[in-house]
């Protein structure tokens, strides 16, 4: 069985999407070469949320399932929603109305032995709380948004510790230095 992956890009100030689920803030910024290709090869299914689906569907009606990784990935896309009855039909997208654990089980089964990638901050948060996220990858983008959807919004919750999946000390902090882009 595949793993449950939380794979996300995040601004320096901790946002994974701008207001209204906007993602255009990432244009012109690139991830390490090979990272997307590795993800595309590993992923067998995607599980997202309704608010993100609706925001993307408003920009690219009928083409949400073709958007992951710039169209390089294809496979089953699941959208968890409280209201599947008013969801717009789209090829390659299945709407689920169940609890998060069951949605993960359904999507993992559809992934056919490959990994399931979470495309929703809220669903990912719930999966973290349930202890069912196997791996978390964050791409820290060199931009500050000021507002939007936070990476892990869980007021009053307990801290969640992660071990780095790299050589060396898995608890070692990552030190990054930046300067304003005008200094290039």
Task: Say what each PLM segment does.
Residues 1-184:
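Enzymes that bind and transform nitrogen-containing heteroaromatic metabolites
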């Amino acid at each position: 069985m595949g793993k449950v992956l939380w794979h996300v890009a995040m601004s320096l100030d901790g946002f994974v999407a701008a207001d209204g689920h906007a993602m255009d803030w990432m244009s012109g910024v690139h991830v390490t070469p090979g990272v997307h290709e590795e993800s595309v090869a590993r992923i067998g299914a995607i599980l997202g949320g309704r608010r993100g689906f609706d925001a993307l569907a408003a920009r690219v009606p009928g083409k949400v399932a073709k958007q992951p990784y710039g169209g390089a990935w294809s496979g089953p896309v699941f959208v968890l929603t409280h209201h599947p009855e008013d969801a717009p039909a789209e090829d390659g997208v299945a709407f689920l109305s169940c609890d998060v654990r069951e949605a993960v089980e359904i999507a993992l089964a559809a992934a056919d032995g490959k990994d399931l990638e979470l495309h929703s901050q809220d669903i990912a948060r719930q999966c973290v709380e349930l202890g069912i996220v196997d791996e978390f990858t964050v791409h820290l983008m060199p931009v500050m948004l000021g507002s939007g959807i936070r990476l892990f919004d869980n007021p009053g919750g307990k801290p969640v510790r992660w071990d780095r999946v790299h050589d060396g000390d898995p608890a070692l902090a990552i030190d990054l230095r930046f300067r304003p882009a005008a200094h290039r």
